[in-house]
Amino acid sequence: NTLTFSADAWRKVLNGSHTLTITATDSMGLTSTRTQTFTKNVASCTFATTSALPADAMPDRCVVNVQGAFPAGCSLKVEICNNGNDASPTWEDITQNALNNQKYFFTNKTKTASAWGVKIRATLSRGTGSGECYISSIGGNYQ
């Protein structure tokens, strides 16, 4: 038999050592118990838009805001592109602008796809950071 955790249940399991005990009882009332120990150690996560947000013309500026817990020792990288429909988008690092809620002006002026589109991605790595370390929301706008 297989024990399956839903993605939502797995996300709620905190990093660290855990013990899982499974007891099976057969039709005769006999039981068998197995105990397994495992360690969960999620050290990074990336959130990214899967489809480009549409733009009627070339986006030239944006404001992006990232909320969460970023303890000393962790690493946060926030990137954006205005040619998100391209096979190889031009990602621009806007980490400091996002953390300080500052406007960013795109440096990219080219696209290979037929339409402009914006994509955002944020990567958080725990590094040596301790305590809560997570991204709770990403938002913003562009023009």
Regions found by a protein language model. Give the residues of each.
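Strand-loop-strand motifs at the edges of beta-sheets in extracellular beta-sandwich domains
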Residues: 1-8
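Beta-strand-rich ligand- or partner-binding modules
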Residues: 9-143
